[in-house]
């Protein structure tokens, strides 16, 4: 048996230092219960010994399928102490994608935390759980022999999987140094004093690195928001925690700026990132909360969450057509190049290459690493695939993507991976996927497919179900459109500009539901809706539900609880729900009459 705990890595030594300096400070709040740094460290040491006893410390990777819970943080820190690279996996991950991830990791084991006791993602896996006494136990086949460690494995703190162009998710090897540099930059920006953070992002999303590691390595407190996305629950959590440092995806921030600005009253530093920040929403926040600093961040997972950022401190900072993505973090560097990798002049757009302390140590699949991590004379650079432009003051401005990568619900999606998954479905010969604007906050994916000649046509709902077994929810297209053949340009290439989602057939809606349907139509970008259909079949997301709930309540003058409408799935259910609470048609007409 091999033990790695006698020489813990840098990140864990930083955690130990915090525990020594402030043992009685609150480290974590979970379900209303505070845990001090001393208590947390004690549990981490116990978990480390449990991992060693089970033989897990001999393996370079520890896949964790977990909710946002205390046991997850304890295990994450224990892995860090032992030099094991932890891999966070969402419980909603489709089984085929889970197996693909584990195959890349070279292991057949999985640690389940905060899960139902009867959950078994796949019968071929060795599943570890905590019993009622907190003892780590396992079931299933024996562990595989540990795979050989790479020379730099000890420098990797976690692997985060992102969408891949080959149809297989890419594992990004995040380094200890990159994580610590992110922590140091944030600590300097928030002026060093202990703060209150909230962890609400998906554990498999790189934002979780910020939400968890920054507070735990700086002596701050992190409150765990355990439930699935629920705007009321997040609002309550942020307020109850007196959260003063918060990270939101840009799309979620835009939603909060429109409907829940009061949620951010106590926040002093708000980080946003993942998509283009709209000046109108930035200005609304800065007007409502003069004491807040809004940080517009930019960065791929391959460069550890944030590579550049731009701070806005007053409404005037947002009075511009485009908000910059700012300047490089300390010890992060980059250059803007043309197609031949030659640096361009100031004011000329080009592709951004990144290097420096935040740089990941390549991909888990070593064959993929040289396709994006370039060995240049001055060192290793990551090709972002992002067009940027730099002004004479050194400010960077995002200009768009070079390839077909898009952001859906804040997640990075490679169009090629979705198209590949579609062509693996029975009878599908060709597939083209495009992102279309759904409303002012969201994009959605539409798929256009051609079946092989003679193959039976499979219903859209069945195809959606099959895709859901292969892809995470945010990568499943909103709609699948059937074509006899794909349109071609004069050059014989697919004419993607002519592929537009068709309007649905008109619906005759009852008068009582016209207000609800009018609002949903605006959100989904579709004029005609079928009452009996699911809102999610039209591409609705959790953000869409928040928007609909807020707008309908605003029109009706109601304060209906979010958790009640979050359970509604069809348009008919929405109509019936609001018909029992108010007369939406009368209220809507009344409001329109006042304009």
Swiss-Prot record:
Keyword Transmembrane helix: no
Gene Ontology cellular component list: cytoplasm
UniProt-listed PROSITE patterns: AMP_BINDING, CARRIER
Cofactor mode of binding and number, as noted: Binds 1 phosphopantetheine covalently.
Cofactors: pantetheine 4'-phosphate
Its EC number(s): 6.2.1.46
Molecular function, one GO term: acid-thiol ligase activity
InterPro entries xrefs: ACP-like_sf, AMP-bd_C, AMP-bd_C_sf, AMP-binding_CS, AMP-dep_synth/lig_dom, ANL_N_sf, PP-bd_ACP
Keywords: Ligase, Phosphopantetheine, Phosphoprotein, Plasmid, Virulence
PTM annotation (O-(pantetheine 4'-phosphoryl)serine): residues: 542
Record-level GO BP terms: amino acid activation for nonribosomal peptide biosynthetic process; response to microbial phytotoxin; secondary metabolite biosynthetic process
Reaction(s) catalysed (UniProt annotation): L-alloisoleucine + holo-[CmaA peptidyl-carrier protein] + ATP = L-alloisoleucyl-[CmaA peptidyl-carrier protein] + AMP + diphosphate
Protein family per UniProt: Belongs to the ATP-dependent AMP-binding enzyme family.
Domain remark in the UniProt entry: The didomain protein contains an adenylation domain (A domain) and a thiolation domain (T domain).
Role, per record: Involved in the biosynthesis of the phytotoxin coronatine (COR) which mimics the plant hormone jasmonic acid isoleucine and promotes opening of stomata for bacterial entry, bacterial growth in the apoplast, systemic susceptibility, and disease symptoms. CmaA catalyzes the adenylation of L-allo-isoleucine (via the A domain) and the attachment of L-allo-isoleucine to the 4'-phosphopantetheine arm located within the T domain of CmaA. It can also use L-isoleucine, L-leucine and L-valine as substrates.
Protein's recorded name: L-allo-isoleucine:holo-[CmaA peptidyl-carrier protein] ligase
Organism: Pseudomonas savastanoi pv. glycinea
């Amino acid at each position: 048996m091999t033990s790695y705990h006698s020489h813990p890595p840098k990140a864990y030594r930083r955690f130990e230092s915090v525990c020594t300096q402030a043992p009685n400070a609150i480290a974590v709040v979970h379900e209303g219960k505070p845990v001090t740094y001393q208590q947390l460290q004690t549990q981490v040491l116990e978990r480390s010994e449990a991992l060693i006893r089970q033989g897990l410390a001999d393996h370079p990777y520890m896949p964790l399928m977990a909710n946002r819970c205390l046991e997850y943080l304890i295990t994450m820190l224990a892995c860090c102490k032992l030099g094991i690279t932890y891999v966070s996996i969402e419980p909603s991950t489709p089984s085929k994608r889970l197996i693909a991830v584990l195959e890349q990791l070279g292991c057949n084991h999985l640690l389940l935390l905060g899960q139902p006791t009867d959950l078994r993602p796949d019968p071929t896996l060795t599943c570890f759980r905590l019993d009622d006494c907190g003892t780590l136990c396992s079931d299933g086949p024996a562990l595989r022999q540990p795979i050989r460690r790479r020379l730099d494995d000890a420098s990797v703190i976690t692997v985060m999987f992102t969408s891949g162009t080959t149809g297989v998710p890419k594992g990004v090897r995040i380094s200890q140094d990159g994580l610590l540099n992110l922590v140091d930059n944030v600590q300097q920006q928030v002026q060093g004093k202990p703060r209150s953070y909230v962890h609400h992002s998906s554990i498999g999303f790189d934002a979780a690195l910020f939400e968890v590691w920054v507070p735990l390595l700086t002596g701050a407190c992190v409150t765990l928001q355990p439930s699935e996305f629920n705007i009321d629950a997040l609002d309550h959590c942020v307020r109850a925690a007196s959260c003063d440092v918060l990270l939101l995806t840009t799309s979620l921030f835009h939603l909060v700026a429109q409907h829940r600005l009061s949620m951010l009253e106590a926040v002093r530093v708000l980080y946003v990132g993942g998509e283009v920040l709209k000046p109108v929403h930035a200005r609304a926040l800065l007007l409502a909360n003069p004491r807040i600093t809004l940080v517009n961040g930019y960065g791929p997972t391959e460069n550890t969450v944030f590579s550049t950022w731009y701070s806005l401190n007053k409404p005037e900072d947002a009075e511009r057509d485009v908000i910059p993505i700012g300047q490089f973090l300390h010890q992060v560097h980059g250059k803007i190049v043309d197609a031949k990798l030659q640096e361009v002049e100031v004011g000329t757009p080009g592709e951004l290459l990144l290097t420096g302390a935040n740089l990941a140590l390549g991909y888990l699949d070593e064959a993929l690493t040289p396709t994006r991590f370039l060995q240049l004379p001055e060192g290793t650079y990551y090709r972002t695939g992002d067009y940027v432009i730099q002004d004479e003051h050194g400010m960077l401005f995002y200009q768009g993507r070079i390839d077909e990568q898009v952001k859906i619900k804040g997640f990075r999606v490679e169009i090629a991976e979705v198209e590949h998954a579609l062509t693996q479905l029975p009878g599908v010969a060709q597939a083209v996927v495009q992102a279309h604007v759904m409303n002012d906050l969201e994009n959605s994916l539409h798929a256009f497919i051609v079946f092989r000649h003679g193959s039976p046509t499979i219903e859209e709902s069945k195809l959606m179900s099959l895709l859901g077994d292969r892809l995470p929810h945010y990568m499943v297209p909103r709609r699948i459109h059937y074509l006899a053949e794909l349109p071609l340009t004069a050059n014989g290439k697919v004419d993607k500009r002519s592929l537009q989602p068709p309007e649905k057939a008109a619906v005759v809606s009852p008068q009582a539901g016209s207000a609800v349907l009018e609002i949903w139509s605006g959100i989904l970008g579709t004029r005609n809706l079928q009452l009996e259909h699911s809102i999610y079949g039209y591409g609705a997301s959790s953000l869409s539900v928040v928007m609909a709930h807020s707008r309908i309540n605003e029109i009706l003058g109601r304060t209906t609880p979010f958790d009640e409408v979050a359970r509604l799935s069809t348009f008919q259910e929405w109509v019936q729900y609001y018909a029992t609470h108010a007369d939406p048609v009368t209220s809507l007409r009344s409001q329109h009459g006042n304009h």
